[in-house]
Amino acid sequence: AYNFRMILTNDPANRIAFSKPPDYDPYRYELLARLLEAKMKQAGKAPQLREVTLIALIPNHKADFNNNGPFSTDYIGKSWDYPNASYARRREIWMDHTNYTKGFFYFLADDPRVPESLREETNSWGLPKDEFLDTDHWPHQLYIREARRMVSDFVMTQKDVQTDITKPDPIGMGSYNSDSHNVQRILKPDGTVENEGDMQVPVKPYQIPYRVMIPKRTEATNLLVPVCFSASHVAYSSLRMEPQYMMLGQAAGLAAALAVRSQKNVQDIDVTRLVGRLKEQGVIMEYHPAPPPPPSVRELFKKITANVSYSPEFF
């Protein structure tokens, strides 16, 4: 699922109140209303805003708002057409996500089915007057977590981020967990709905091979792909973070220079030399966990005396 990472402020002097978006329909958020009602019954009190959206505080009385929970800022199931869509269709999808997100916050701020305390908390936030001045204070970028990707001779898959984690041609390391947001919302025969596709699986640091960003020789010999690289959905869910993009971009730049200077195709460069240059520049290719700290005197005493018993006469 895609969403907008919202920058909001709780500074009254800098805050723009949430407004009703075009074609607003409160029943679009019916499941959110039912979720809030269920949370109230379960906890015996009104839910807080952080229960339906992730709030990461940043300086200047602002916060980064992201998806959190089964009904939040992710517009589940509405991103499917985007990767292969025309530019016109992509604009439609973009605006649909915009109006959904505006409606999400307006619903929380205005709808009578939302507990009063949650409405008040939502209304304490708003778009900042001093951000995104050229787009009516709305974020410039839709969070496109995953879109079109190259399919090369080597496709990085789940095993490459979980079990087969060393490679002969490493250009960096990844360590972010496999993080897939929900893919679709399914209506079940019993009348309930179920979100499908969310995945949060920890991984150990793994090596990223040069091969992920070189195309098939039959398709191109002068192209390097450091973002839309050759990876499955599960592998990409871990690789799709900015630190990995920066590592791959650095390696792509060096590889391009080596290809030009040696007059070779990107598939034929000296990868050993590429890896060596990356190491010289400080790129980490191996992970060695830090040794545990030495035990304290208190911990040593507990360990030594754990199985020792004393008679009453001892005291």
What does each model-found stretch correspond to?
Residues S296-F315:
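Disordered, acidic Ser/Thr/Pro-rich linker "stalks" and the adjacent N-terminal cap
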Residues A1-F301:
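Flavin (FAD/FMN)-binding glycine-rich loop and adjacent Rossmann-like elements that form
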